[in-house]
Amino acid sequence: MTSATAGLNLSDSVYERLLRERIIFLGTQVDDDIANKLCAQILLLSAEDPSRDISLYINSPGGSVSAGMAIFDTMQFAECDVATFGMGLAASMGQFLLSAGAKGKRYALPHARIMMHQPSAGIGGTASDIAIMAEQFAHTKREMAELIAEHTGQTVEQITADSDRDRWFTAQQALEYGFVDHVVSRAAQAGGTGQ
């Protein structure tokens, strides 16, 4: 009989061991470094076995829109399903990625908090540059609202209204809103992910 940890020793990092189980973890602010790491992990695991799910655990305050969109696009690009698990805090881009998991495979742990708001950015420079950046920012805001609507079943207008200011959700409220498909308190309740 072999165990899931056969061949591993104590010097293996926790994250390496999780990766071998097809579990990846976003436990920081979303930036280019973590986005590149997660994208590489998703691509690697998808190439290794496109028939097995990847489980992405999210405990993140959010962060960079462009870095988050790289993760989002890679999740959609992967041949295998990416199941998402909200734990602790899934705010801003963390919420966006949580709701972007494979339909039917988006989970929140019971005490997770989910927060949605409109994207924000600091803009500076010449008047012409500010006008260009403002136009790009408006496009990004609209695009994100459309994607959240697609993943939650809400209308774009509802997402736009609800994200005007910080809007907080309990795990149960996130389920009712459509960010997640299940609230689970035990791994066995999320059957089939990472197996």
Curated annotation (Swiss-Prot):
Q: Which residues form the active site?
A: S92, H117
What compartments host this protein?
A: Cytoplasm
InterPro entries associated with the record: ClpP, ClpP/crotonase-like_dom_sf, ClpP/TepA, ClpP_His_AS
Which terms are listed as keywords in the entry? Cytoplasm, Hydrolase, Protease, Serine protease
Catalytic activity from the UniProt record: Hydrolysis of proteins to small peptides in the presence of ATP and magnesium. alpha-casein is the usual test substrate. In the absence of ATP, only oligopeptides shorter than five residues are hydrolyzed (such as succinyl-Leu-Tyr-|-NHMec, and Leu-Tyr-Leu-|-Tyr-Trp, in which cleavage of the -Tyr-|-Leu- and -Tyr-|-Trp bonds also occurs)
Class in the EC hierarchy, top level: hydrolase
Q: What is its EC number?
A: 3.4.21.92
Read off the SUPFAM superfamilies from this record.
ClpP/crotonase
Which Pfam family, any one, appears in the UniProt record? Answer: CLP_protease
This entry's Gene Ontology molecular function terms read: ATP-dependent peptidase activity; ATPase binding; serine-type endopeptidase activity
CC annotations in GO: cytoplasm; endopeptidase Clp complex
User: Which cysteine-cysteine pairs are annotated as disulfide bonds in the entry?
Assistant: none
Q: Which GO terms describe its biological process?
A: protein quality control for misfolded or incompletely synthesized proteins
Gene3D superfamilies the UniProt entry points to: 2-enoyl-CoA Hydratase, Chain A, domain 1
Which PROSITE patterns has this protein been placed in? CLP_PROTEASE_HIS
Role noted for this protein = Cleaves peptides in various proteins in a process that requires ATP hydrolysis. Has a chymotrypsin-like activity. Plays a major role in the degradation of misfolded proteins.
Family recorded in the similarity comment: Belongs to the peptidase S14 family.
Subunit: Fourteen ClpP subunits assemble into 2 heptameric rings which stack back to back to give a disk-like structure with a central cavity, resembling the structure of eukaryotic proteasomes.
The name this protein carries in UniProt is ATP-dependent Clp protease proteolytic subunit 2
Q: Which organism is it from?
A: Rhodococcus jostii (strain RHA1)
Q: Which gene encodes it?
A: clpP2
